[in-house]
Amino acid sequence: MKRNITLTTLALACFMGMAPCKTKAQNTVPSASKDVYDFKSFTDTELLERFAELVEKKRKYPTNEELKTWGIYEELEFVRSHVRKRNIMSRTDRLVSDTHAERDLLMNIPCGSGKTYGGYPSHDFMSDNFSMWNYTNLFGAWNHGLFQAPGSWADAAHKNGTDMLSGMKFFDTTGGRQEGSGNWKNFITTKNTDGTFKYAHALINLLRFLGLDGINYNWEASGYDDENVIKFHQELYKIAQQEKFDNFHIMMYTSNSSLSTWNSEALWGKNGARTTELMLNYSSSDFTHSMGTSVQAAEQALGTSKGLYAGVWIVSMNRSWSRLNADDNARKCGVCLWGEHSESRFWSYNTGGDPNERMSNYQMLLERAFSGGNRNPLTRPSISNSGNDWEWSGTTPPLSKFAGLATWIPERSAIEGKLPFSTYFNLGNGDRYSYKGKKTAGPWYNMANQDIVPTYRWLVVQSETNTVSNAIQPELTNRDAYTGGACLQLNGLSTATSTDIVLYKTSLKGTQGDIYANVAIKSGKDGTNPSNLYLIVRIGNSTWKEYPVGDTTDKNWTEKRIKLDGISATDAIERIGLRVKDCNENYRLLVGKLEINDGVKATPSNIKDLTIQVKEETKTSLSVKASWGIDAQGANGLQGGLVYNDEGNIDHFEILYKNGENGRVSEVARTTQWAAYVGNIQLPKESDEPYIGVRSVSTDLKTYSPVVWTKIDRANQSDLPVAKDNPYGTVELDMVANGAEVAQKIRYITDFKTEGAEQDIIYHAEQPTGGANYVDATDKVIKVKQGQTVTVKFKGYEAKDNVDGSHDDLRYCMGKGWLDLDGDHLFNPADLTADPNHGECLFHLGKVRAGSPEQVQGLVSHSFTVPQNARKGMSRLRIVFSDAWFAGSLVPIGKFNKGFAIDFGVEIVSDNAERPVPADTHDQGEAAEPEGLTTTGITEVAGAASALQVTNEALNFNNVEKAWIFSVDGRLVEYLTSPQSYRTNKLAKGVYLVKMQNKNVIRSQKITVQ
């Protein structure tokens, strides 16, 4: 496999690439920093050293003060998972009966996009929100170093009964690479004076402190079969068993494509002592032929093949899928999908014309991969080793002919126990945050706000039968939301009397009182209209009960409370679904909430130690990172370890916002972590007073803790940057994607001109723009008339090996151009030629995974005709290039991969009738205040904004109670209390990070000492 850059290397490079303040007289604004996360202190060996020191002191876990000294306190809660992993229910009643009941799936792929920072909460709506946990046993987090996988992804996994590995340790000496395991081998085999392994207890304690479930190896080098390495790994399993850490894993991947008696002790175990779990290397990128014999070797060594996976490289899906059921032994072998290092092939291959279309396509691509090409696990295409194409073929979507992983892997559900059950069908992201249908905040991404996923995607049948129905097609969409950023959309395809969508396999019982449901729906139609929707639940093995949801009375979201007569607390609810009666091809309904509850009551633990970090502050906006604790202690909490949410009767947390002490309260985020990021809070007035509040929500879903509020004092307006407001949305280079630095140097447009317009323009660039690799050239305005044909010509910079050291320029990109023709400040993804009434995509150039030298060796020419009814006034032409190997990032808004973007102004003139501005179908108006607010909220005393003035001789602090100075490698250099001034001659030359705390608000600033 290709080299995986280590956390230390990447974090150091990222840190050094930031623009620090040099030690000359200058006022700095720490809160203006755009560097949201700082993981340079999360190196595996350093953390293990820290935890080994605690073991020597007869302790397992660190104090908060120690965490601050280590430099990880502010980021820690973004790495931890406080969601207890749910247990998987029996799979004996699996949908596809000829699958092996215990066969498991390992998704050994990245979480999120980009090394180190991928998957962490952000305001990037267009982000990887993998959701097929209903088939996944174990997730690999391939793009993160050990102990640094995002806790938000672990939360999503744990809710669905999936284990999350903590990240990767990478060794590869194949093909002459020099990435050996010697240093790591020597480190982990270090022993104490009594002969015990120094870091064994430390590693287990560290994982349990983080709430992550194991470690992941790519060990394509020597050393894994070293006697002491074997004993160390076996000792880890022994300690985990003693600690009742029952879902601990060591996932091993080596050059071996088979398990046998000669390597089983190193790669599997011996005499009842497990060494590792194993991903069998692929054979010529395909499944190994040795699945059956490897299963036999595993059973001979440990009596089980659980934890053995046959790997396949999913750069292509045309693989030998038929080998998976070659014989009875092969059928027992788990399956592992691998690919790739910084983002998964599912995400990089997925495309869409705009962010919403790409996100919808992503969920449907996942469904075809897992449930089969028909997106219904009950009716799958036949097994084929070819024709399983990643790309669209005309109007045929990718993987439409694939049999689906459901052919071999049984579905999984972890929804058991006591009511309540609730879902908003959230996927972990949104182009806005909505509360009861109305917008409260902007774009967001947080996998800790992904709801439990449906067990079946999608089990659509004729009512109360196992006969497949094609009358209704469900989909998860981000185009609207009741609360959060997504909802379930039901689309009618044909006429049918009654159709069931079976969503969840469950084993749920009530606690007390009447059982009821809350269901939120939206028809988008004015007036009173029948929803034709029924909630259905199956009691026991066979009895279905249906309950009408009722009519909609307008086009907006409405929430219905439904009494579930005939169900008592002793009845076991085994299936939950929806039924549509009398549907036709015009049927369309959104479902934004499905909750089943009863009279249960539980008091949630209170919030404590709320800390706010201010980021990305401008004159009119700011972002916040919040972290907190709770006043509960579980079994581990008594020793200073991890406390699970359920030990505090907590289902989730709500992040609230108000402008002014008595301002109107809005819910702006939810999470199951003890941390949250809320981006770009708008503060249009200098007098605005932002308050951030956090409260816990009970497991009963109707009881709340008091809100803990913190006022955010603004930095001086004169010192803050002006927000870059782009009415057409931000488009920028993905800085954590591979090759970003190459794009900044040699991927850009040098020449652009128009011909045939009322007013033509000429643009020329002598050098790259760098940074976000976006050029705002809207001061150059093209004037066009309705019905006029215009030609655009442009050329990319041609890089030369002897000049630039590379020719990796725009020839290796694909590009698109869009023109807003209806005045909605959006870019309709449809092609203008194919759809002249709606399309706004003018051209598409380049080839998938191939070079196009003509893009840099001469002017590329494209002509288009402005529609006769184009909306008059000022508009925008946007051109975006993205790497040809990452076609999914070629969209008009968001982050492009290793590419370039430029905007030009356009003025449309003439006297023809103009097309209307498309209606915004979201609910309009101000959102309601959150439920359960009381006057007993707690407002913590705020402190003035910390400030740092840097001179040639000193660091001068203002409004700082505590300060920490860290070196570039994360080492604490100095801890200061109530500092006024600090002499810089105490510091060696170099880059430092200064963290300053006043009350419970933290700001950070980088400095350079020269």
Predicted segments, located by residue:
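C-terminal outer-membrane/trafficking sorting elements
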Residues: 6, 18-24, 932-1010
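Chitinase-like catalytic core of GlcNAc-active glycosidases
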Residues: 98-290
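Conserved aromatic anchor
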Residues: 622-646
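Extracellular fibronectin type III
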Residues: 700-717
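Extra-cytoplasmic beta-strand recognition segments
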Residues: 443, 488, 499-532, 560-562, ...
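Beta-strand-rich modules
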Residues: 678-705
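A broad "non-catalytic interaction surface" signal
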Residues: 718-920
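Short carbohydrate-recognition loop motifs
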Residues: 470-500
